[in-house]
Amino acid sequence: MHNRKRKTVKKTVSFSDDQNLTNANLNNHRKGHIDDDTPPVYVRKSWTLIPFHLLALLYWFLKYTDFNLLALLYIMIPTQVIYLIFRFNKNTIYGKKRLRLNWLLVFITLGACLLLSIPCLAIIVLFGAPFVELLKESWLLALHCCFLTYPAVYDVFNCNFKVGYFKKYFISVVIGCWISCFVIPLDWDRDWQAWPVPLIVGAYLGSFIGFSIGGYI
């Protein structure tokens, strides 16, 4: 008589009461955890995210304020908070749900942006900004850059520090500043060429573009 070889049966041990959940976990393991690659946080594609208020502020700054950086900052900060509450937060999805507004975090993020202006100032100075004679102007530039990214900073805190997704909003401000630098050395002798007015304009335009198309990138 021929000895028949018994087929070995692979046994799995599960501590879950839900057999369907166990099967789903096995399927995910076989697929190589494809679901892990999907981003847990994203911003919806919507025209309501276009920050028209930044263009309005920029027009007012260039037309009527005699390039008053402090006055522009005082108005920009509350408008950014309003933009976060009624636009950016409502279009931010974390996992499969829309995030509720965390009022405490709204105010904490304001303080965080203020603190972030210090390392931002250091970076600006390292890239050649005047430090001694125009320190106030350089710090105002750092403050504008940090508060322009205020909605993104809030979502970084509110979404478990998912910096990777929101870094594009910071990069857009940096690129705007960098591109606008070319007008400063031009021999035009215009008031708007004074430090750091061109970089402020570039930062606002970069932020406008970044928040407008951020959901599509």
UniProtKB/Swiss-Prot annotation:
The organism's place on the tree of life at top rank: Eukaryota
Subcellular localization, as worded in the UniProt entry: Endoplasmic reticulum membrane
Membrane topology of the entry: Multi-pass membrane protein
Segments crossing the lipid bilayer: 41-61, 66-86, 107-127, 139-159, 169-189, 197-217
Location, primary (coarse class): endoplasmic reticulum
Any one Pfam family match given in the protein's UniProt record, by short name: PIG-F
InterPro entries: GPI_biosynthesis_protein_Pig-F (IPR009580)
GO terms under cellular component: endoplasmic reticulum membrane
UniProt-listed GO biological process terms: GPI anchor biosynthetic process
Glycosylation (residues): 20
UniProt pathway: Glycolipid biosynthesis; glycosylphosphatidylinositol-anchor biosynthesis
UniProt entry keywords in alphabetical sequence: Endoplasmic reticulum, Glycoprotein, GPI-anchor biosynthesis, Membrane, Transmembrane, Transmembrane helix
Record has Magnesium as a keyword: no
Task of the protein: Acts in the GPI biosynthetic pathway between GlcNAc-PI synthesis and GPI transfer to protein.
Family: Belongs to the PIGF family.
Name of the protein: Glycosylphosphatidylinositol anchor biosynthesis protein 11
Taxonomic source organism: Kluyveromyces lactis (strain ATCC 8585 / CBS 2359 / DSM 70799 / NBRC 1267 / NRRL Y-1140 / WM37) (Yeast)
